[in-house]
Amino acid sequence: MEAIVSAASVIAAGLAVGLAAIGPGIGQGSAAANAVEGLARQPEAEGKIRGTLLLSLAFMESLTIYGLVVALSLLFANPFS
């Protein structure tokens, strides 16, 4: 029974990282595309657009880091065993 729990934890860790990266990856691509479009329309607003973009990318990346933390806790501090 413990082997099944260990195997399920490894699979869940992989799914946690993979699924946690899908949403932010799509969001970051969309944000970067819109930032480039905004820069093409208004080059004089480059500083403001860049600052907002970097802040929003950091918030989106934090979701992926939370998925990584969940995966690491499933692998090394397994709460099910």
Curated annotation (Swiss-Prot):
Record's protein name: ATP synthase subunit c, chloroplastic
Keywords noted in UniProt: ATP synthesis, CF(0), Chloroplast, Hydrogen ion transport, Ion transport, Lipid-binding, Membrane, Plastid, Thylakoid, Transmembrane, Transmembrane helix, Transport
Family (UniProt): Belongs to the ATPase C chain family.
Gene name of the record: atpH
Note: In plastids the F-type ATPase is also known as CF(1)CF(0).
Keyword Transcription: no
Assembly and oligomerization: F-type ATPases have 2 components, F(1) - the catalytic core - and F(0) - the membrane proton channel. F(1) has five subunits: alpha(3), beta(3), gamma(1), delta(1), epsilon(1). F(0) has four main subunits: a(1), b(1), b'(1) and c(10-14). The alpha and beta chains form an alternating ring which encloses part of the gamma chain. F(1) is attached to F(0) by a central stalk formed by the gamma and epsilon chains, while a peripheral stalk is formed by the delta, b and b' chains.
Domain of life: Eukaryota
Biological function: F(1)F(0) ATP synthase produces ATP from ADP in the presence of a proton or sodium gradient. F-type ATPases consist of two structural domains, F(1) containing the extramembraneous catalytic core and F(0) containing the membrane proton channel, linked together by a central stalk and a peripheral stalk. During catalysis, ATP synthesis in the catalytic domain of F(1) is coupled via a rotary mechanism of the central stalk subunits to proton translocation.
Natural source organism: Cyanidioschyzon merolae (strain NIES-3377 / 10D) (Unicellular red alga)
Single GO MF annotation: proton-transporting ATP synthase activity, rotational mechanism
One GO cellular component term noted in the UniProt record for this chain: chloroplast thylakoid membrane
Site features described as Reversibly protonated during proton transport, chain residue numbers: 61
UniProt-annotated location(s): Plastid, Chloroplast thylakoid membrane
Its membrane topology: Multi-pass membrane protein
Record field: transmembrane: 3-23, 57-77
